[in-house]
Amino acid sequence: MDKILFDEKNHKFILIGFAESKDEQGIPSNQYLIQHKNKSILIDPGGFGLFPILLSRLLKYTKLQDIHTIVLSHQDPDVCGGLNIWLEMTEAEAYISNLWLRFLPHYDIKRIDRIIGIPDEGMDLTIEGKFYLKLIPAHFLHSPGQVNVYDPVSKILFTGDIGAGMLPCSENNLFVEDFENYKKCIDGFHKRYMASNQALRKWVKNVESLDINIIAPKHGYLYKGESVKKLLEYLYDLKCGIDLL
């Protein structure tokens, strides 16, 4: 399934993959594409097995030569296992936390020269003219070097594994419709994969100042409206990781 989440003037934010690959049994994932004028940004393209279906979707909206940037939230294979083929097929530069630069060669990536490290404090990534993406640190929230992506035009925050849910679960469609019912789908994951409540609170305080219309995680349903507020409140109070030892 692909769905345009935002479309205004020369700017789009598109969900191009939603938890449907048969190769991803147990860990279904979401992939996103941002288009700004003639520049396209691919977020967390996933493993090699996803390439054919993502390519067919992507070509509905853009051209391979227009993929300007790839942003990787962290080092896991469901995020960047297929990175080599995207670097071979495009001229894009890929961005990932500095922490993971020395590990990526283990994915047999040939074009390491086109991978750029993101500093621990995050950065504003200029795409064209005045348009930029905010790359926001989310360290120790699953990965010790995780990065979120905020698009100030669409007001969509890509949160990587934060807010992730295991599917199929609950009676939702694309967006979380009943957060209280959906909590059982995210509770176990967050208690095990997030390092601590201290890390969660630091992240919540960092992002709650943003104007957010949609939270788009790497796995599971998306959040909008009241569910954005409820997710942040839930995470702020959650005991997880080392809190449970």
Can you name each region flagged by the protein language model?
Residues I43-P45, I67-Q75, A94-N98, L157-D161, ...:
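Active-site neighborhood of phospho(di)ester-bond hydrolases with catalytic His/Asp-centered motifs
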Residues K9, M89-T90, R111:
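Short, structured coil segments at secondary-structure junctions
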Residues G47-F48, P77, A164, L222:
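Short, glycine/acidic-enriched loop or turn micro-motifs at the edges of active sites
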